Amino acid sequence: MQTTGQSIDFASGHATRAIVDLGAIGGNISGIRARIGAQRRLMAVVKSDGYGHGAVQVSRAALANGADCLAVAVPEEGHELREAGIDCPILAFGLIQPGEAWKTVAARLEQTVCSSELLDALDHESAKAGVKTNVHIKVDTGMGRIGLPPEDAVEFARKVMSCHNLILRGVYSHFSCADESDKEFSLTQLGRFKRTLGALEAAGIPVPIRHMANSAGVLDLPESYFDMVRPGIMIYGLYPSSEVSHSVALSPAMSFVTRVCYVKKVSAGTAIGYGATFVTTADKTVVATMPAGYADGYPRLLSNKAEVIVKGTRVPLLGRVAMDMCMLDVTSIPDVQAGDEIALFGEGLPVEEIASLVGTINYEIVTGIGKRVPRVYV
């Protein structure tokens, strides 16, 4: 019996798990490195808790296999990495408010900038801390999100250089359509970015790191590599869409699994799940219950649509996905018992299949795996 004061690992033996293969992460990074060459920097994007895989563990695997630096969305994510002892350069992609500038400085991050107010705040906080903060100017070449108009880049860069406690480390932009087979707009964006870089050079403004390539850029647009690439989804072994090339062979790193928790036989005419949206038509239908639902990141839109794998065989989901449980028809599989493993996605059942059934992308599925699901690293 556990006694007071002892640490209890409640996650140990948890039925529903996300199994993360760090060897696959390392292999994917190595493949990206081979693709881009040794002369360019590789920034591993580990925002959203490493796309749901675990930012700290993914970061360590990436850095051990050829990544030079990391990227997060917000300073809080960078702080978590610093607390874990990760000391490499970390860029925060998100545009923070001036009142949050202290977070970037405190966590020793590099910060995306495209507003004078944020520049002033970063300069002030850096001066207070007695440090210099690296910044990367974001240029909007067609994403329509954050970033300066290209024609404002030179003036803004001059303002950065006038801030005594800031260092212009990089200038970058982001593709909006590079994961589509038609690269016309991506090439338009690339042209705008090149002209912006040319204007900065003509103005005598040095830019140490120029970067634009996301995962789709790495795969399909080598002319966008510049000084550094920023792969995200492909680190995790997933392609950004079905329209990109497979110029880098990738191994999916995550498998989402659970175990059967209950099995029973029911007669024809038995309603299954909330709303009674499924009613059995055969006698002696064997129904297995699994302890995973939409709170774990298994979308409710999979109700009456998805299949899972039990003992190597695909079986259908019966009825609605509930918050914590789902039911399966395992009649075709002999002797299914509580404790038998179930694959929700992974080998033999790609996450893209799940995403397609609910009308979304693989990114959303893996980043949506719930926080109560332990990540198990192999």
Language-model segments: residues:
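Active-site anion/phosphate-binding pocket segments in diverse small-molecule metabolic enzymes
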Residues: 1-22, 26, 30, 34, ...
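Active-site-proximal beta-alpha core segment in soluble small-molecule metabolic enzymes
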Residues: 4-12, 16-20, 24-27, 40-211
